[in-house]
């Protein structure tokens, strides 16, 4: 069977959308930096709604749901800011991810994704992520990014999702990005949810392609 690591499909970070309260409060002492035009415009990520079964049909795509921490990456003039769903700025907590994002050759971009740690089964584990943070050892922490909200001078939120993902895949395609990954998606198919859970995923996040 394929592991989550092998299929390299990051979830819509909506993996953190319905997390217990203690996840939201983890490391809550982190300082918040001054806002920029981009952090003000894209202040909070879009959250998912929990349903029992994923929708089907060619107009939908599906992403593996990670057991990690939702993050938004702001790339502005060579500087990188990683902001949690709760508004905490964490670039210093994940220097490897921050440094690799800084090598991306774009002047301005906003990426939406998930940060997590893979366990021995190749599935993300929130407890492993929490352990890495408590030990102040972020070497095993990786980032999976599934959406591109802004690129250069353009707000892409009204652009069809598939087009945004194509652009995101392009800017994350460099081989040196070993800790930063493009989060791919799956097409609708029978038993898709069962297959996702079979490889250790928490579930699926489904989105309309348009």
Predicted regions and their residues:
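Catalytic cores of nucleic-acid ligases and guanylyltransferases
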Residues: 1-210
């Amino acid at each position: 069977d394929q592991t989550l690591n092998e299929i390299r499909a990051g979830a819509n970070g909506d993996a953190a959308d319905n997390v217990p309260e203690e996840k939201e409060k983890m490391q809550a002492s982190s300082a918040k930096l001054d806002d920029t035009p981009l952090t003000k415009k894209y202040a909070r990520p879009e959250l998912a709604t929990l349903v029992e079964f994923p929708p089907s049909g060619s107009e939908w795509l599906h992403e593996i749901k990670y057991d990690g921490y939702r993050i938004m990456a702001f790339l502005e003039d060579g500087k990188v800011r990683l902001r949690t769903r709760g508004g905490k700025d964490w670039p210093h907590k994940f220097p490897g991810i921050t440094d690799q994002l800084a090598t991306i050759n774009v002047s301005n971009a906003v990426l939406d994704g998930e940060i997590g740690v893979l366990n021995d089964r190749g599935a993300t584990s929130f407890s492993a992520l929490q352990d890495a943070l408590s030990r102040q050892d972020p070497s095993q922490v990786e980032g999976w990014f599934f959406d591109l909200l802004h690129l250069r001078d353009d707000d892409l939120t009204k652009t069809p999702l598939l087009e945004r993902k194509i652009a995101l895949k392009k800017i994350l395609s460099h081989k040196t990005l070993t800790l930063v990954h493009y989060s791919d998606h799956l097409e609708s198919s029978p038993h898709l949810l069962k297959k996702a859970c079979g490889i250790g995923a928490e579930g699926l996040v489904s989105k309309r392609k348009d």
